[in-house]
């Protein structure tokens, strides 16, 4: 979960403080999460993790957990996989020498390396309705941000949030400009997004002037 920020960063893009069978919501965080994936594009689902490479020969696989308590992901029973399957984790443990959110897991029905290889880059999500309501008015799911209007400090609508990706350096807001054209990415920090008004269906952003500027021309090839 995420919480309204009290610092320069809005932190984890994933549910925080999750406990088996008792996930609540996302907190507007204090520190950034380094999860590589955006919030689930389906607002009825909340992203919990992403599979990586196989581990060993007997079906185990690496999993990046997006939950505040990484091992909690194994306690939610059947989960929605991005390839359309329903998958259930049977076992999870911290990956040796890895970051705290990197796990070695076993998936029910997967007992060999080829099955584990087929899981690589597949994400796991949970139905939002299974998570209950936020316990704190400052808590929310990052999927709640998708569809919000983006206003500049003067109150002019400059775009709409279409995704909340995280490529390793902190959460980003992908914004479709109101004037049309390609989307742009804005760091989801208090400096760039000082106001978040879920009830009002908007955020107030203070973006750089060139946020929606087209990329400059590529430098000419060196004739030498």
Swiss-Prot record:
Keyword Chaperone among record annotations: yes
Subcellular compartments: Cytoplasm
Keywords, in A-Z order: Chaperone, Cytoplasm, Ribosome biogenesis, rRNA processing
Transmembrane segments: none
InterPro entries, sorted: PRC_barrel-like_sf (IPR011033), PRC_RimM (IPR056792), RimM (IPR011961), RimM_N (IPR002676), RimM_N_sf (IPR036976), Transl_B-barrel_sf (IPR009000)
Region feature (Disordered): 1-46, 204-224
Pfam families found in the cross-reference section: PRC_RimM, RimM
MF terms in GO: ribosome binding
Gene3D superfamilies: PRC-barrel domain, RimM
Domain notes: The PRC barrel domain binds ribosomal protein uS19.
Described purpose of this protein according to its UniProt entry: An accessory protein needed during the final step in the assembly of 30S ribosomal subunit, possibly for assembly of the head region. Essential for efficient processing of 16S rRNA. May be needed both before and after RbfA during the maturation of 16S rRNA. It has affinity for free ribosomal 30S subunits but not for 70S ribosomes.
PANTHER family: RIBOSOME MATURATION FACTOR RIMM (PTHR33692:SF1)
Protein name (record): Ribosome maturation factor RimM
Species of the source: Methylorubrum populi (strain ATCC BAA-705 / NCIMB 13946 / BJ001)
């Amino acid at each position: 979960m995420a919480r309204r920020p009290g610092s320069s960063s809005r932190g984890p893009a994933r549910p925080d403080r999750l406990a088996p069978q008792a996930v609540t919501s996302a907190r507007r965080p204090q520190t950034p999460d380094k999860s590589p994936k955006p919030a689930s594009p389906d607002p009825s689902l909340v992203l919990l993790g992403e599979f990586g490479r196989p581990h060993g020969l007997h079906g185990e696989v690496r999993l990046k957990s997006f939950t505040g308590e990484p091992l909690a992901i194994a306690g939610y029973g059947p989960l929605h996989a991005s390839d359309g399957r329903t998958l259930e984790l049977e076992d999870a443990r911290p990956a040796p020498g890895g970051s705290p959110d990197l796990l070695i897991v076993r998936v029910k029905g997967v007992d060999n390396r080829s099955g584990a290889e087929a899981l690589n880059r597949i994400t796991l999500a949970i139905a939002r309705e299974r998570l209950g309501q936020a316990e704190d008015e400052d808590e929310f799911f990052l999927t709640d941000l998708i569809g919000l209007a983006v206003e500049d400090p003067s109150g002019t609508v400059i775009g709409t949030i279409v995704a909340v990706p995280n490529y390793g350096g902190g959460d980003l807001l992908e914004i479709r400009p109101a004037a049309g054209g390609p989307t742009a990415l804005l760091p989801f920090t208090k400096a760039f997004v000082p106001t978040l008004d879920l009830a009002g269906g908007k955020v107030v952003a203070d973006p750089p002037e060139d946020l929606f500027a087209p990329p400059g021309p590529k430098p000419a090839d060196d004739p030498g």
